[in-house]
Amino acid sequence: MSHDGIDLDEFRTGLADSVLREIAEHLAALAGSGATAAIDLRSLPLTNADRSELESRLGRGEVTVKLDVAGTSELWETRYSGVWWVRHFGDGGRIASERIEIAAIPQILVSHDEDIAAAATRVREEVEAHGSA
Amino acid sequence: MAPRETIGEELLRHGISRRALLKYSAYLATMMALPPMASRAIAEALANARRQSVIWLSFQECTGCTESLTRSFSPTIEDMIFNLISLDYHETLQAVSGAAAEEARLTAMRENKGKYVVVVDGSVSTKDGGVYSTNAGKTNLQVLKETAENALAVISVGTCAAFGGIPHANPNPTGAVPVSDIVTDKPVINISGCPPIAEAMAGTIAYLVTFGKLPDLDALNRPKAFFGDTIHDRCYRRPFYDKGLFAKSFDDEGARKGWCLYEVGCKGPVTYNACATLKWNGGVSFPIQSGHGCLGCSEPNFWDKGGFYRPLSTSTGGGATVIGGAAVAGIGIGVASALISRRRRTDATKEPKS
């Protein structure tokens, strides 16, 4: 995005370096003790260039997931196992929440116990309805 | 009355998975500057909470605040707020009208006595008994007193409800006052702005539902999560201010190069709001990014400060100094007591000198 001579896409503040150092510490902790962590990227004054730099240096790994709940979300594991980029979109496709999660798997991907119980009921009803037809 | 379902139960009944709450929790944590790892605990708290009864009263206002909150056209993360609350009364949005509408308000007040939240947009007319703004045969003043009496808390959305706003501007023909001048015996949260940022309204309500307490407030009773920094502090043009590079008019070289708008009247340095970070219209832009200085619409008496295009360094009748001082003091004070902050607010909203 360019505005009157300021190109916000090109302006780097150096924050990408800082975030990478923080990720490195958290990932070492995950590897050592299993401690999970998260970094809220929206709370940091990242420019578009900073975000692009961070995204590029973390790269993309083997897993990419698209979520469709309360709007869309995109998650991917970076090329560093255990480092996940989690991006939730809001109204008009803007980024509503964006975080780096350092975990074996982001919490939002895990099926919740109550959802599993409700699904078990629903699928039983489906089987019974089909059987009585 | 049968107890309301928990939010988790209701979402489950509608086939919405717990992931929706986890996602909203991440969004809420971002908005309210909460620790990112708190998301899971927030989601659990929300799942076990009951929908918050909300009564929305519209007084001397333009409906811009409601427009700001409901501007979304497709199901998005922002809409989740409507799964967390039971909007029991809202004149613009409710389907019923007339006596049935008023009965809905009275029913919600009766069934949720001491637990409902009152949201007000618009200032309150007090002159001649408040006759200049009435609805259903009652003055706004009467309805506010009656509705707030057994409320848990009151949220004043928009600068009109928070500080009197444009109806309060000189010569204030209706005797308009902010809600906090009328409601003095319970918490009043101010979400100022003309209009306020939707996330600030939704985030504050969601925080109340989740934690059952008020968020940290500044000296003007505004949530610090949204009003903790000035526009100037978070402005992408700030480096030009620091270098002394200013636009002198709206069509000069400085304006074309995107330099700081301080000298063409920007009120960013004394205006506390989150426009520079959350932005508007789905995060597209905010006034300064569009080439116009901040008007200071989230501060008291912004309409009467001597001109939108006059630099702050010229006299503005003392208003800017008072506001800047009060707001800076607020950061040091932390969560101000209602009495102290009310006194400061009264100082800041006093009639400007002509």
Locations of the language-model features?
Chain A
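Short glycine-rich, low-complexity/disordered patches
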Residues: 33-45, 63-72, 132-133
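Generic structural hydrophobic/aromatic packing signal, biased to beta-strands
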Residues: 23, 39-41, 65, 86, ...
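Helix-rich interaction surfaces within compact, conserved domain-sized segments
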Residues: 73-133
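N-terminal domain-onset segments
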Residues: 1-53
